[in-house]
Amino acid sequence: MRDHIVIKGARENNLKNIDVEIPRDALVVMTGLSGSGKSSLAFDTIFAEGQRRYMESLSSYARQFLGQMDKPDVDSIEGMSPAISIDQKTTSKNPRSTVGTVTEIYDYLRLLWARVGVPHCPKCGKEIRRQTVDQIVDQIAALPQATRVQILAPVVRARKGEHQKVFDDARRGGYVRVRVDGSIYDLTEVIPLDKNRKHNIEIVVDRVVIRPDQNRRLTDAVEIASALSGGLVLADIPEEKREILFSQNYACDDCGISIEELTPRMFSFNSPYGACPTCGGLGTRLRIDPALIIPDPSKSILDGGITASGWNSVKGDSISRMYYEALAEKYHFDLTTPIGDLPENVREILLYGTGDEELTLHYDTNRGAGVLRRPFEGIVCNLERRYQETQSDAMRASLEDCMAETACPDCRGARLRPEVLAVTVGGLNISEFTALPITEELAFLDSLELSEKDAKIADSILREVRSRLQFLQSVGLQYLTLARSAATLSGGESQRIRLATQIGSSLMGVLYILDEPSIGLHQRDNEKLLATLRELRDLGNTLIVVEHDEDTMRAADYLIDIGPGAGVHGGEVVCAGTPEEVARCERSITGQYLSGKKKIPVPAHRRTGNGHALVIRGAAEHNLKHVDVEIPLGVMTCVTGVSGSSKSSLVNEVLYKTLVGKLNHAKVRPGKCDGIDGVEYLDKIINIDQSPIGRTPRSNPATYTGLFDDIRALFASTQDAKLRGYGAGRFSFNIRGGRCEACSGDGLLKIEMNFLPDVYVPCEVCKGKRYNRETLEVHYKGRNIAEVLDMTVEEALAFFQNQPKIRDRLQTLMDVGLGYVKLGQPSTTLSGGEAQRIKLATELSKRSTGRTIYVLDEPTTGLHVADVARLIDILDRLTDAGNTVLVIEHNLHVIKVADHIIDLGPEGGDAGGNIVFTGTPEDCARCTESYTGKFLKKELES
């Protein structure tokens, strides 16, 4: 067996026909500047080829459903293993996905609660026991005399298939009718069923009229139904349109409530047998939120204080104004009074209506004038009714601006039916258990006392649950709960969850490719992650990790530095070897930082700010413990703390959402806090994250930064364009006129290939240039619009040197290190770090007011140390212009250059949410209670 993976002639994206040898069964780290070609080699070449070879081993029928990957642009790869990619882009946004379901721990928990759970009555809480035939008969016989009852035997419950054998058996048993999915059929007819849908089938055993002389017949029917269905009896009362399910398995004597024998699917919130019927297993419902109807209570009704659709007009002839005036007349208030100052009962009436009390409405329209008398339903009730009744997607979207997710009123966020939540193990129901942090769940399982019989049943289940929980703990996720929605996880958290799942699978001989697993991880937990990676390697696997973290690089068995620059300046193997060998390589920028020849300097002076501050009072969102925080304005503040210490809750949920509502007038529900003081010193808040700058290939750096508008205007001002009568719109590939209509301005045509992957071919008409022939005949300095879009930022800067407006925008893109990016490069091909730097460049090109607060959540994601140095320069420029920069960060290079630090903790989850330290980095390094301070001290001293 080969001891190396040998790659020859890799040319994917910007790779320059490189040859690489990667040792097998080793921890291999690939590093290099953002855009240097690391991901092109690791994911687009090695992983893509591993996946493609696996797909080729399948039948063409299977490939039709799975899709197939293109062969990467590489001459050969030898020594490949089956490849598994663990990246950050596959976080599930499905509201039904939780940490428990993603890790499959919840499947084991469902089995545990079904096998050893103790059922209780959901009404009285009494432990439930099985029902006998006599008890079932007595309850049916207690119905009003002359009631008609059908006794049914549920033989198939929510199972796919045609079930013809069930019908044949029923015919042979002498039965005449069955009920299928709620409809009665005669067994003499053919009953066709869709085998791909789930069906419910009940055999009609007897039809009984409740009378004293029918007890014998009723008993026989119940016994037969129970025997047919394995203990279940369904009493259908057609006149009352209701059914009663009885079980010889479990029932409450006092309340008469029956439940089926416990099965794992009853504990699934994704199954109709377990899901709360009110919210369908989501745990939340979209409800009209009064805070989004009246986002600013300091405004009056006439000042536009009510922003809800249909109620935001205060024109004299509007229906809403007619209602407001009638309400003001009846309840004696002024429409110019701030809504927050109105009496409590008036605000209640505005939102929830007058009940049966009528208003006197005066109308005056083109059709005439008059008086109406009618009650007022209230803005909240009106919006909820319109939301339920409308068929318009646009109206639904408009009304959702006033809605917020609230806990389901019935299950209170637990997602399951009441009878399922009444089943306990060790005194906890399954929802209560999954709401515990992982550390507490492990402690609960260790102290769980079961009977000898139950302990034997649960032994193997508990072993699996424990090992998976311990894996999550080993990758630094001990603060998470299994009930946590997967959609709320950061990229780093979701990646480490999948990493823990892979360790649990104990596979050997696999090639794992990971994308920055250290993201979002505090230095304190880094060693745990490295131990996990080593464990995965020691099982006999090869790990290729794309990473910039210095600790991970030093822990590698083999380090590959791709570069030397980014984009067209990268794509080569600068150096490959042990970390010590790379550190000695003069040509390697990574090596220079590893050896200490290059470093990011600590600033000689810290900014002290403009004397003003934002003060957050009583922040209590998620795990925050009613903390008060002061954020100085005019400086760069770094919010730090271990993973799960509530950094994002404080900055993104409380601060950002409150300020974006007040300053940018956005409709969002902010996190819980008593208030924020000092907002008057700011005029806007901007969140610069790593989300894509566009979702389609039509979006590119030129369109996002506004550069393309200036370039189109320049082309429209040329002599060629004026002679032809072309305006700036002629040079857009998004509208008819100048674009190529054969490909609608895409430059590519998609050819569907059925069981082969879709093929994208250049448009035969425009040859991929996006524009029609006439548009491409217009030139500026000898170049047409398509040729300009194909330029890199660096080339364009030289080309447009005499156009100050365009030159300045291009210069900011150069300043943020994006000289290698093409102006027309589709936004879908940009990395998160590149997208973020384009946003930063756009902000740098704007005229600063000095009153803006910029929020960045882990901006160093995907950035090499050299890129981090450039990022720090940009943040310094924004701060030096008088603005405030607030950064959530674990990267010590950023933390050490901050003017002010807010350290949260001390731990993650419930043990976090407190302010551990505030002050300068030097003072933080001296704080013994701060984990950040301990690592910062080493960084400042180095």
List PLM regions with ranges.
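Conserved phosphate-binding elements of NTP-dependent enzyme cores
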Residues: 1-942
